[in-house]
């Protein structure tokens, strides 16, 4: 985590307006993080980029999805502030490292209040979708700059959740979100951290093997597991990876995927000539999103999907 911390300190000390002056004119891109990361990953590890399905999402697409989610929250869920909503709900959650025979899973429960509109990007990448959500929410505070500082700490950061598997993307996401929040005038506390975690969204946990890096991974996994277990995610959005030859074959996600291998509303096997495509990573991320929305009893799933989603019979499942 020191890489993220040190990089963030460098950006805090820099005059970013001078750094960014003329950027778009020189690169024909408006996002410096994407410009850096695309070039870096293409040169450093193009095979990993292909294997992980890591591709740039056009800003216009990101803006459209975030704007649409905001409007649906207002129109269909009766939340006038949309993505900026501050309402809370009461939930019951398990307490880690507790044992209590009074509960079926052996864990003590506690009742807590948590924000209703929780956002999750399970394939965060460089943080483009979460950053766009921050920008759109900030626009709602036009002329109310004095309220922004308190709002971010109390009502925004606790609702922004992200999972990312690649260390480079994870680092860039933290830098981007720190940068965009600073640009809005927000001043972060020293002990404050973003809820973007280094983890595989399609797995349940990492075991701590004792090394310093493993301990770091364990802390990240614990943060992600808290979201997977206890957070009532209402909005799942992003651009998950596509990979027909998926390497994500963990027991948890494959068990969830069994629901997609049956004819709709039956227990009959899916009648598909080549059903292996249901195991594409993007299908698994759709199932992950459905898992969160189902658990919350309501919500929005807003992904950029492979075009085959609209063309293959498999998608009917």
Predicted regions and their residues:
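Long recognition/docking surfaces used for binding and targeting
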Residues: 1-45
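Conserved small/polar residues in nucleotide/adenosyl-binding loops
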Residues: 313-317
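SAM-dependent methyltransferase catalytic region
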Residues: 23-24, 28, 32, 40-312
């Amino acid at each position: 985590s020191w890489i993220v911390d040190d990089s963030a300190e460098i950006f805090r000390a820099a005059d970013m307006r001078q750094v960014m002056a003329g950027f778009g004119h020189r690169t024909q891109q408006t996002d410096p993080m994407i410009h850096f990361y695309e070039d870096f990953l293409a040169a450093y590890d193009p095979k990993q980029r292909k294997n992980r399905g890591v591709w740039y999402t056009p800003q216009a697409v990101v803006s459209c999805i975030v704007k649409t989610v905001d409007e649906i929250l207002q129109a269909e869920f009766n939340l006038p502030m949309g993505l900026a909503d501050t309402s809370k709900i009461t939930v019951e959650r398990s307490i880690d490292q507790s044992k209590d025979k009074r509960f079926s899973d052996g864990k003590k429960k506690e009742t807590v209040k948590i924000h209703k509109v929780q956002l999750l990007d399970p394939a965060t990448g460089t943080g483009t979708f979460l950053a766009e959500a921050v920008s759109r929410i900030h626009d709602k505070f036009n002329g109310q700059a004095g309220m922004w500082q308190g709002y971010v700490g109390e009502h925004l950061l606790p609702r922004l959740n992200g999972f990312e598997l690649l260390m480079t993307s994870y680092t860039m996401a933290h830098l981007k979100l720190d940068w965009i929040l600073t640009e809005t005038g927000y001043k972060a506390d020293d002990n404050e951290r973003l809820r973007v975690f280094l983890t595989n969204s399609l797995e349940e946990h990492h075991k701590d093997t004792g090394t310093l890096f493993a301990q770091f991974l364990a802390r990240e996994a614990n943060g992600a597991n808290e979201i997977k277990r206890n957070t009532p995610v209402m909005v799942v959005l992003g651009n998950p990876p596509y990979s027909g030859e998926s390497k994500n074959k963990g027991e948890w996600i494959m068990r969830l995927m069994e629901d997609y291998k049956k004819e709709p509303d039956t227990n009959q096997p899916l009648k598909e000539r080549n059903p292996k495509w249901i195991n594409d990573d993007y299908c698994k991320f759709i199932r992950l999103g459905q898992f969160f929305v189902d658990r919350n009893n309501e919500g929005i799933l807003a992904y950029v999907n492979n075009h085959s989603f609209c063309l293959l019979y498999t998608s009917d499942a």
